[in-house]
Amino acid sequence: FKRIAEQGWKIVLTTDHGTTRVDNAIKVIGDNNTNTNLRYKVGKNLSYNPRQVYEIKQPKRFGLPLLNVSSTYIFASGRDFFAYPNNYNHYVQYYNDTFQHGGISMEEMLVPLITLTPKK
């Protein structure tokens, strides 16, 4: 960085969003067309407890793709992750205390950005 600054270059440094360590499983049921992400689901036949998720029933209002007429999005928050009832205990043990992408968290919503300008 020192050599770059000596030449008068400005540096813009950024990175991808982060991950979230998950440790709380939430049961969700979806059909065969439901995506496999552990922190968000999109589908037309989702079954879940609406008090445990952030749900979006009108994706177009939020700029999200509308995969079919009745698409619903649900997002995990905090340290939650989604698990299906079949083999529930296996998946809970397998994914508990792992780092996952997706969902609603500071790590997922904020993208770090810094601009370094050399002193004159």
Regions found by a protein language model. Name each.
Residues 1-120:
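Feature captures the catalytic ectodomains and active-site-proximal regions of enzymes
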